[in-house]
Amino acid sequence: MRKKLAPAAVAAALLALAIALVGCSSGPSDEEVIRQGVSEELAAIKAGDDELISSVEEGAGEDLKTLGIDARDFMSAYLDGFDYSVGDVKVDGDSATVHLSITCRSMGEATEAFMGAYGDALANAEDLTDTDALYELAGKTLLESLSATQPKTVECDVQCQKDSDGNWSYADGVSEQMSELFLSQ
């Protein structure tokens, strides 16, 4: 798709992958084109592909590095248990609705767990006056909190639109909708 579907966020970074969904009159139906494009995009997220990792590194790599966390390790922990299914695709002229079922960890829930666990770790830590040691403790606690957060399944509908060239893309607002889903579900 042309517009990006932000599947996950790390701090201020939204993770995005783009796939062009090009429909042609003699090829597959609009429903098939949309289903294939959405499925390929979500499969790339599930696999933690290099484009996804690069997106995380670009958006939050320095913050993760400060905590002693590699972007690939972070995404591996976040995506553990990630799954999806593409349900009904309903096309109505130049617009379409795609029903998705997504199973993933909630970044909001993981952050909340981290705050409590890090506070407890600081209260129980002795002689942690070195800034690097504090960051290392925060990084370790963040990964543990993320790994302890259980994946949840949520259902949502996303809107797609066809342009004048016959190409399908996500409608305006889908990126924000998916970011909200991944951050707070």
What residue ranges belong to the model's regions?
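Outer-membrane beta-barrel and related beta-rich outer-membrane complex signature
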Residues: 110-114
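Bacterial N-terminal signal peptides that target proteins for export
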Residues: 1-11
